[in-house]
Amino acid sequence: MHILDSVDKASLRSDIPDFRAGDTVKVHVNIVEGSRSRIQVFQGIVIGRQGEGVGETFCVRKVSFQVGVERTFPVHSPVIDHIEVVTRGDVRRAKLYFLRDLRGKKAKIKEKRS
């Protein structure tokens, strides 16, 4: 088991900012199309984080053209170029799955005061 722990520790990223559910983030994802690669930005609200260590993931939700889009990213994935925290949200839950049923201003999250 100690060998697996050392391999896991080596593949953890150290450049991940501190973010939690309710925060609005920009995830810069590296997209490879044939021989070309480009960076695509996915901006939305973090609705939850799951797991720990190498297998930790987070789910980001945004509304694009009146259609809700959710995307789950591994936190320590090499596909992620970097994560940028836009705003901090003031929420009382760890999982914000109730946002899936809300529309318009009801789906808005209060900004945390600093």
UniProtKB/Swiss-Prot annotation:
One of its GO terms (biological process) is translation. InterPro entries: Ribosomal_bL19, Ribosomal_bL19_CS, Ribosomal_bL19_sf, Translation_prot_SH3-like_sf. GO terms for molecular function: structural constituent of ribosome. PROSITE patterns: RIBOSOMAL_L19. GO terms for cellular component: cytosolic large ribosomal subunit. Pfam families: Ribosomal_L19. Keywords: Ribonucleoprotein, Ribosomal protein. SUPFAM superfamilies: Translation proteins SH3-like domain. This protein is located at the 30S-50S ribosomal subunit interface and may play a role in the structure and function of the aminoacyl-tRNA binding site. HAMAP family: Ribosomal_bL19. Belongs to the bacterial ribosomal protein bL19 family. This is Large ribosomal subunit protein bL19. The gene is rplS.
